[in-house]
Structure formats: C-alpha cells, structure tokens
Design a protein with these regions (language model features):
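Acidic, His- and aromatic-enriched active-site or binding-groove loops in soluble protein domains
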Residues: 120-146, 174-185, 222-229, 234
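Catalytic-core signal marking the mid-to-C-terminal active-site face
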Residues: 183, 190-193, 197-198, 221-414
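Single conserved hydrophobic/aromatic residue that forms the stacking wall/gate
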Residues: 1-14
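A generic structural motif
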Residues: 68-74, 131, 171-177, 224-226, ...
C-alpha cells in the first residue's frame, strides 16, 4: 500500500519524529480489519524534502513514512517494508541493488470544467521539438522542479505517441529510486496542472498508439564493483548476470500482476506497440521482455521492459531483485539470447521456439500470480492475499461491463 498522505502542522513535527503519528488503517483498502485498525507512521528522516511548488511563505515539507503496528513491529502490508526485506537479504549476500527507471507519461488537455480528458492537439513523435512538441515547456518546468529537489536528470524527450513524454533520472540504490518515483509522479501531475494540462500515468490511455512503460534498468554491486560485467565472457556478462536473467524469466508471468496491475495494463502489452510480449532476452534487440543495453563495465545492466507506471515501484523492485536472487542462489540457466524481432512472429511461431508469453489479461496474470508460490512468499501472506482479492474483483467487474466497442460492433447487427 502506497500513495497516501496526511498533513501535520509545524508544532506537531517533534511528536511525529518520535513516531507518534497514528491513523486508522481500516479506512484504507488493503490494510487491516476494523478490529485492529490503529496503525502508526514512522517518518524516514532521510527523505525530508521541501515541496518547491507550494507557497514559499509557510513552506511545506514531506517525509516518506514506514507503517508500523501499535506494538512497534513493521506492518507486513507496507510495500516499502517488503522492499527493505529483500534488500536486507541481498545485503547479507554482499550485494547492493541499483536501479534506474524510464518513466513515461502523457500530457493531455482538460475540459472546460478542468476535468481530465485523453485529448491532445499535437502530432509530435519520438525526439520531436517545438513547435511540434507542445508539451516541451511543461516538461522543462517539471525537470527544473525535480532538479530543485535534488534529482539528477539524465535525459528527457518526447516519446513515440502524441503527447507522450519520458524523463529519466540517475541510477541509485533501489529504495531511494522507489521513493524518487513516488516523488516524480507527484511533481509531474502538479506541474502539469499549472500548465493547464493533465498528466496521466495510465498505461494505455488511447487505442492505436504506444502505451506508457516504466522500464527498470538494474544491476548488482559487490565490493563497489558491478558484478554483472565479465570482460572474459564473449558478451561481457558474468555468470551472476545470466543467473539473474534466468530468475526474471522464471518468475516473469507471476510478477505480471504486480508489474502490470490494471485491466488497462494488458492493452499495452500487445504486439506492434514497442511493448514486450515474449518472455525471452536479447543483447540489443528491443522486442523481448529483457534487454541488455550495449554499455559494459560499470554500466552493465539488465533492462526489464514489462512494468508500467501504474505499478507500485516498491513491489516491482522487490520482485525484480527477489527473482534475480532466486536465479543466483539456484544457479538457474538462462536460455540463449534471441536476435529475431519478436513483434513480427505469431503466437505459434513463438511457441515453436519454446518461448512463453506474458499474460494477456489481468485475469491470466492473477492466475499466474497464484501459481508462483515464491513470489507470494516474497510479498508475504497479507499482501499476497489482499492484493489478489482486489485484482480478482477488478477483473470480474471489468468483465461485466458493456464497452463502447461492443455497442458499436453489435447493437445494429443483432
């Protein structure tokens, strides 16, 4: 559970530093029953940050918080706690997990009442500039805001679809990166609103265009060195890197329910729109689920291409690391890399290559999640049970809906 907030006055700050901020956990879906509702927020003082878009007279700051039970133990339903647990396991093995996300989003117009739409008047595409890129000023304002908060922005540009943008920030340790993603999304939405726009992280807001992803670039360090690199290997990859890839491939289907959490997520994961479908890997080819970018040495990394920006970053990173560690611990063997463009192959051709595919719907993803006991163990019983219940409910509600497509296709004919 993430993406919630509570405000406190300045006179209350000292109490909150002593972890005395109580809230009603039963009022938030997925937390606890009403019989055990009292929960506490423990602020992480390292995450203190002034929000630059708020009035400078009477400034507003924020902390990321961990959730605890009244008896002083971490709440097992806190996704930040889940990530911390997996990071502790990695640390015991001598590893530091570094992550760099590629965050994509859309900037749409609002209607006369200020409500969001999925309308845009621009026709810009990949790497376009003004006057085609109508969102450039908003994107630049977002970047300047993030930089004032300590972000190191590595790149930003217009993406393939009209009104679609990407901003990449510097690699960092996983917990810091997950916190940064939460801050990033808040800043993007806030600054976009100032420009009269609505920022959407919905994976596929319109038919017929590319959806938005949140590719996860990751590496492991040990004793200050990137252990995914091995100059003696023909591809420059270490045995740990191959094992890590194998772990991701093994658990990719079960992870989909977390990495792609919405009904809409699976409208993005279709052939032809630069999103992965086939569970395989490549050194350069961008069509498989996993890609190894060309950089070697300290820059050697694995790019996991299925996650979308609707996903909880703490859980995504926890599962990516846990899957990779499973591969390393059990010395799983990665299949041969794929050089073909997987987007051009049929399902039958992919199956003939003994390559599996990602779930096609949220319902299939729920089934795969339920079958992957290792993934459930990583998340813990509380999150696994509550999350699966919520996603099953979401899927069943969607299946009962009558869409505009159905009305247009069937009403007149039948």
């Amino acid at each position: 559970i993430r993406d919630r907030s509570v405000s406190r006055g300045l006179g209350d700050v000292y109490k909150r530093q002593d972890n005395k901020c109580m809230f009603d956990g039963s009022s938030i879906e997925g937390f606890v029953r009403i019989e055990e509702s009292d929960m506490y927020l423990y602020p992480d003082l390292n995450t203190f940050e002034i929000l630059p878009w708020r009035p400078q007279h009477g400034k507003v700051a924020r902390f990321m918080c961990d959730v605890y039970r009244p008896e002083g133990v971490p709440f097992e339903g806190d996704s930040r706690y889940v990530l911390k647990n997996v990071l502790k396991k990695a640390a015991k093995m001598g590893y530091t997990f570094d992550v760099g996300p590629e965050c994509e989003f859309f900037l749409f117009h609002t209607d006369d009442n200020g409500q969001p739409t999925n309308i845009t008047h621009e026709k810009a595409s990949y790497f376009d500039v003004t006057p085609l890129d109508l969102g450039e000023n908003a994107r630049r304002d977002i970047i300047l805001t993030l930089e004032s908060m300590g972000f190191e922005i590595e790149a930003s540009h217009h993406e393939v679809a009209p009104a679609q943008h990407e901003i990449d920030f510097k690699y960092d340790e996983a917990l810091q990166t997950a916190d940064n993603i939460m801050t990033f999304k808040l800043a993007v939405k806030t600054i976009a609103k100032r420009h009269g726009l609505f920022a959407s992280f919905m994976p596929k807001p319109k038919y017929g265009i590319n959806g938005s992803g949140m590719h996860i670039n990751m590496s492991l360090e040990k004793d200050g060195k990137n252990i995914f690199f091995d100059k003696s290997n023909p591809m420059g990859l270490s045995k740990e890197c191959y094992h890590f890839i194998a772990g991701l491939i093994k658990h990719a289907k079960g992870m989909s329910c977390i990495c792609n959490p919405l009904v809409n997520s699976y409208k993005r994961l279709v052939p032809g729109y630069e999103a992965p479908v086939a569970i395989c890997w490549s050194s350069i080819n961008r069509s498989p689920l996993i890609r190894i970018p060309a950089s070697r040495g300290a820059g050697t990394r694995i790019e996991f291409r299925s996650p979308d920006p609707a996903a909880n970053p703490y859980l995504v990173m926890a599962l990516c690391l846990a899957a990779g560690l499973d591969g390393i611990e059990n010395e799983l063997e990665a299949p041969e890399p794929i050089g073909k463009n997987m987007y051009l192959l049929t399902e039958e051709q992919i199956a003939d290559m003994n390559i599996d595919v990602l779930p096609a719907t949220l319902g299939e993803a729920c089934d795969a999640f339920e079958e992957d006991k290792y993934i459930q163990e990583v998340l813990g019983e509380h999150i696994s049970k509550k999350y699966l219940e919520a996603k099953r409910k979401e899927w069943h509600e969607y299946c009962r809906q009558v869409s505009d497509w159905e009305t247009e296709a069937y009403l007149y004919k039948y």
